[in-house]
Amino acid sequence: MGLRRAKSIRHNGKRLQEILAAHELFFRGQEGGVRANLAGADLSHADLAGVNLSGAILRGANLEGTDLRRGKLPGADLSGANLRKADLRNTDMTESILPGADLTEAQASGVEFFRCDLSNANFQRAHLRNVNLRGANVNGAKFSGADMGVAILRETDITGADLSGVDLSTALMPRGYAAQKSPQKPA
């Protein structure tokens, strides 16, 4: 099954392609622009690569398996959104709002999560290589089993995050962080 195109997806009686065009005008401050409100939208398995959703409202949206590579989502509200197995590689999500979002098994390498609210988000088994989590709120976030090689966690309070089973040996950690070794199983 291939990815769905924006022109074939509808939300609240409007074509997604039209919503995205109006949002682009809004983002540029041009006449006729309207902020995209895609709260609760079914955008699963959609091809949204490179789309500008800066400041868009995507609360509770279903983006499972969606291609958002190289997208622009700074300041977007993705609270409680389903991003399971989504492709977010090299996406800018600076200051986005994602509390309670599900990013299980997401391809999120190279994502800019700078100063994001990721509280209680689920990143289990996600690919998070080379992500920037500087200044992000990760309280209650679940990273267990995630690939976080070369992740930037400086200026991030990770005390409330579940990092079990995560290899942080190549990550840039907060000052004073002492890696805790996993207990060794007897041979």
Identify the residue ranges that each predicted region occupies.
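Tandem repeat scaffolds
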Residues: R4-E18, E24-A187
